[in-house]
Amino acid sequence: NYYDLDGNLVDNVRKDLKGKYNTYLYTDKSVELVQNHDQTKPFFLYLAYTAPHIPHEVPEEDADRFASHILGKRRNYAAMVSVMDEGVGKIADALTNNGMMENTIIVFTSDNGAYYKSVGSNYPLRGGKGSFLEGGVRGVTFVHSPLLQKSGYTNTNLHHVTDWYATFQKLAGDKP
């Protein structure tokens, strides 16, 4: 049985998806949403992949791609990152093929540093997920859009996702 946050029984659980790798499911659904979008209306897609997260589980055929050069748990981690990267690429291709990329902002970010007790590394930073040290709170981000006035540079300043709101408003034609 499955229950929502209020304790109510959820009847419409997709049992036919049992055993499917959720990174593939999230990507396929996102591509479907892009392909079926009415382009006369605004479009917002928030995709929160669970990869690469503990437990480091991935279909065996994906992990096997790294078998010759990555050992142990890092093989699954590498495969998870690779499948996620390919998924982002498929979504970007769908946006391009549907004429939406020229008016799109893509933000890719993480919520914390790597968990140092597993396969991650934040070297040369100290700490990791769950700590307030820089290795725990610093994450990677990229922003891609033809709408940006300045591109192709690296910003190492401290920022938070809430700092972007005014920029996104301006790019959307609204006043911050």
Which ranges hold each PLM region?
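Formylglycine-dependent
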Residues: N1-F43, Y49-V58
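Alpha-helix capping and helix-loop boundary segments enriched in small/acidic/polar residues
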Residues: L17, Y21, G72-S82, Y116, ...
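A long, amphipathic alpha-helix that forms part
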Residues: Y21, L25-H37, A63-T104
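Metal-dependent active-site segment of extracytoplasmic phospho-/sulfohydrolases and closely related
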Residues: F43, A48-Y49, V83-G120
